[in-house]
Amino acid sequence: MSIILNNIYLKISLFFLSLIFLIISSISLYISEKLPEAQEIREIELQIPLKIFTSDNKLIGEFGEKRRSAVSFEDIPPYFIKAVLAAEDDNFFNHSGVSYSGLLRSLYRILISGEIQGGGSTITMQVAGNYLTGRDVSLFRKIKDIFLAYRLESIYSKEEIFEFYVNRIFLGNRAYGIASASEVYYGSKIKDLNIAQWAMIAGLPKAPSAMNPLVNPRRALIRRNWILSRMYDLDYIYKEQFDLAIKAPVSASYFGLASQVDAPYLSETIRRFMINEYGLDAYKDGLEVYTTLDSKLQNHAVSALKLGLESYDKRHGFRQPLNLISLFPENFFFQDLSLRLSLIESSNELPVGLSEVPEDQPLELIYEYLNDLVTSDNKFPVLVISVVDQLIALSGDRKIYSLDWPSSLGWARPYINEDQRGPKPKKYSDILKEGDLVWLERDKVNSSLSLTQIPEVQGSIVSIDPNNGGVKALVGGYDFFLSKYDRATQSFPLLGSNFKPFLYATALESGFNASTLINDAPIVFEDKALEDKWRPRNSSGRFYGPTRLREALVQSRNLVSIRLLREVGIDKVRNYSKNFGFQPESLPSDLSLALGTASLSPLKNAAAFSVFANGGKLVEPYFISKIVDRSGEIIFERKEIIPKQTVDPRVAFVIKDILQESAYRGTAKKLSELNRTDFAGKTGTTNEAESTWFTGFNDFLVTSVWVGFDQPKSLGNREFGSTAALPIWLDFMKPLIETLPKNTSLPPPGLVSIKVDKKTGRRSEGTSSSSIFEYFLEESQPD
């Protein structure tokens, strides 16, 4: 009987075992058919953002939803590998893709909770999920991950799987992969971190938000210390290393885009171009754009423009700040702040510096308002609380700042208008009151604070290679994050006297020469186009009589230029201007053209002056030299374009020679500070000084500076191209002067040098000081 029962039990057992095997086999076959190919991982392209670089490989900008930089296994620090193993899968290098003990723990949690939860996955299974099966939490996905893990282990090495893992994982704050995480949280390469920092990053995959050191430093610290303990228990680190790392504070901070060069205006222009050419995929395809920008020139351009605009701004006084009292209910915050301040002062907690306001104060509206304001460089907004003895102000980060009156605030005379200021202040209450919104500036050297203001005046600076049009530096305004409007490429201010060289070049092409006399005398025009009487004058208010064209251009004489335009012909000048890149139909058709009522962007103006710098060739400005895909293959490279000869090289040479003279004794004589004789330049000031210019150049670099307001208004009666724009150009050039080559060009054939009398412009045989040598086109020699 027992034998029969045993046979029955055996048959039943075999049946159920066969049934289980059949079920497992069927499930395996079903899942296998549903599984993606493990080999596809190699073909899956990680989303890598668009990156923009200077010509010397410095990062300008990065655009994309995800910040990611791939890293190879060989470049991963050994202690970081150990930190990841301690946190995620300490048996990774020994198992075949699946941890059975981990799966049992996961199954136990499912039975206890009744819910499908995460956990129990090896690094290999996580790679399968991250790359192939998705992020949903389900039993079916977990089973797929198990099957795929075995396949992955049979195809790839452990090192390759680990590399897949660390380059794909999300680690919070848009950081994907360990290379980006180290830059986001520590501003450093992964190889340059320490054990405590490696452990912190290794703890992020479990909960990139909840255990983020920026969002929740307490939980992040607990997670990090648990990983360090695991590393010590697994003999990954020594006791001394553990003791040192466990005591380390949370040192993570948010490091935004680690651009090495401040060029947001240009990077935004290139971003728009890339989206237009390549679509939205440009944000994730890992394209790298290499520009013509020179990092050294760009950095100098940014600092020179900021300094120049701030200098102008301070010359014209301290503008009355916006007062916020009216925006809030009466005594909404000042009574509360006064109470808080009295408590701080009574306990001697408020030294010259700052103290913190507790979170329980009803000031959230003010904090929100201040934090919504865009900071500028090292300047930040504060709300004035008191100006009785000191300036006491509240910032958006809940800090109270107190500043004594410094002698350096003599500039802060109250602004009345562009030509008038009030009396020199002696204390803060002379210029401020409670509720004022003002800006403080932190000194970059000693971190001291001072009252400042954000300039309303704007400007731009563009520097290009005159021989090929490559843009070497471009700044489109005071601060991109305060105003994204790119004045270097998108604005078209009136040129003022910056147009005169183009007029004089037309005259030389039309038979005039540099010694031709034009009378500098008062004149009234009945100009039908202007529909009024027009009484132009020189900026000096004086008249100089018969004047050689060279002298007229050197000194930027308005009346000579107007008469010259009338003699040459307005239509001829308009048509000839296309040789410098102008659109003739866009130019005014009246005599005001002589004084620069033509408009041109600073970028195009630099290109126009390049015609004088390069011997008469018109170049087309460009930014991009090449575009490289994620594999390093060049998908676009700008071919060398030979510029078209649009102006007689002799004419270009003579105009350049005249503008070189202007640089040491004319309106641009401040250029003599450079101690170089090969630079040429021209100032420009429009009517009422609404736009001011300076464009200076030699054979190798052309730089154009514009200063004005976005909504045109006078810069002031004492402001000219020589006071507002030229100092910016000089500050830009001075650091570069030692490395910039000197001119090598010689007078072109067909140009002759003849001695002439300074007053008459005619040939001179004498040796007196009244004679000079002048260049002439051989067909336009004087009598």
Regions found by a protein language model. Name each.
Residues M1-F53, N91, L111, Y312:
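N-terminal type II signal-anchor transmembrane helix
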Residues S25, E115-L394, L564, K578-N579, ...:
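Non-catalytic, structured segments within soluble enzyme domains
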Residues S69-E74, D419-S429, I454-G459, L482-F502, ...:
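Short active-site loop at a secondary-structure junction
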Residues V84-L85, M231, A301, D389, ...:
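Active-site SXXK
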Residues F93-L103, Y176-A179, Y238-Q241, L508-K528, ...:
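Short, well-structured active-site flanking segments
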Residues I112-V137, K191, A258-D262, N467, ...:
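Conserved catalytic neighborhood of penicillin-recognizing serine enzymes
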Residues T291, S295-A304, S311, I344-S376, ...:
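A penicillin-recognizing enzyme superfamily signal
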Residues E531-R537, G569-A607, E620-F623:
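Mid-domain, small-residue-enriched loop/turn segments at the edges of structured enzyme/sensor domains
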